[in-house]
């Protein structure tokens, strides 16, 4: 069955020179368009299959995109394209690099969200004050501290010393700018937060575990090595990242290391973020991307799913 695309959809499929910023909600045909764009990149010889990187935030979106792309191509070609979630890609970066470097964690266990919460509950059992805190609040604070550690490059073999350094920096900042009233970490530290993060990290280390924030943080750390980063940047000529509305600023910072000299397309629905609590700030990311990479901005405003639902609704 042939598919008819509207003008804006055709523009996304055919524009292979400029970077693109696509705003497209559910039902606008975005995933189909992305799969046809990948096929067009290959047909026009703009990149080989193994030089295309497609990333999503959720597993569901990743599976759907992979299925659509596979339906456009033969299996062997489709299988060469890197189609991952952002965390899956970070995992790939870590494990691939670990094979080449003796200093990097070679074998580790991934702690998903539920594993993480279980370990946190076990950790706070030793700190009575912390039991009054909501578990998701503790998760958020731990992830914020991990992110600060990565961004500030505070990495030694002494976990306790590293987080104590961050703690004292935080106290100094609050004292200087009088920020403690509105700061989540201040409250966390008042409820034994420093001991919680240290003991949580030590427990993870003992079990050779990495949580999802660790995947991003360690990929970010690896990309600080220009040789490693350049190697990954040269792998891909075309990069498409979907679900940007749910991508955190830290994840974007890690991925942006791959952008220079490549063709980049970001897509998402900036009005439908459901992960704001984990650092998702679509407008901040879109503004930064627009300013630095001067993309063609396209908005899919025709919702085919809504039209179909209206047509299928029986008359009253």
Residue ranges and their predicted role:
Residues 36-44, 67, 71, 217, ...:
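Short, well-ordered alpha-helices that flank and scaffold nucleotide-derived cofactor binding pockets
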Residues 46-51, 72-81, 97-112, 122-135, ...:
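Short, polar/flexible loop-turn hinges at active-site or ligand-entry regions and domain interfaces
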Residues 61, 65, 116, 134, ...:
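Helical mechanochemical/support elements of P-loop NTPase systems and associated helical scaffolds
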Residues 84-92, 239-243, 267:
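Conserved helicase core region in the C-terminal RecA-like lobe
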Residues 88-89, 142, 295-296:
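N-terminal helical cap/lid subdomain that shapes the substrate entry/recognition surface
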């Amino acid at each position: 069955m042939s598919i008819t695309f509207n003008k804006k959809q055709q523009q996304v499929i055919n524009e292979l020179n400029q970077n693109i910023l696509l705003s497209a909600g559910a039902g606008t045909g975005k995933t189909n368009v992305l799969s046809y764009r990948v096929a067009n990149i290959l047909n026009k010889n703009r990149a080989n299959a193994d030089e295309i990187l497609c990333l999503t935030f959720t597993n569901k979106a990743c599976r759907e995109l992979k299925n659509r792309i596979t339906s456009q191509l033969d299996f062997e070609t489709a299988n060469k394209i890197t189609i991952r979630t952002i965390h899956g890609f970070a995992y790939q970066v870590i494990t691939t690099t670990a094979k080449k470097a003796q200093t990097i964690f070679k074998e580790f266990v991934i702690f998903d969200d539920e594993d993480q919460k279980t370990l946190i509950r076990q950790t706070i059992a030793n700190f009575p004050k912390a039991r009054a805190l909501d578990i998701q609040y503790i998760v958020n604070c731990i992830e914020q501290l991990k992110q600060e550690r990565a961004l500030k490059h505070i990495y030694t073999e002494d976990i306790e010393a590293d987080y104590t350094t961050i703690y004292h920096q935080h106290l100094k900042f609050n004292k200087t700018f009088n920020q403690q009233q509105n700061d989540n970490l201040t409250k966390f530290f008042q409820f034994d937060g420093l001991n919680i993060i240290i003991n949580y990290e030590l427990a993870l280390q003992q079990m050779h575990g990495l949580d999802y924030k660790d995947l991003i943080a360690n990929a970010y750390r690896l990309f600080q090595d220009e040789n490693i980063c350049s190697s990954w940047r040269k792998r891909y000529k075309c990069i498409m990242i979907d679900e940007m509305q749910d991508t955190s600023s830290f994840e974007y910072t890690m991925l942006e290391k791959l952008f220079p000299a490549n063709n980049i397309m970001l897509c998402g629905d900036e009005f439908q973020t459901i992960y704001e609590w984990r650092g998702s700030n679509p407008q901040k990311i879109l503004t930064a991307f627009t300013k630095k990479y001067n993309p063609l901005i396209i908005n899919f405003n025709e919702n085919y799913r809504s039209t179909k639902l209206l047509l299928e609704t029986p008359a009253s």
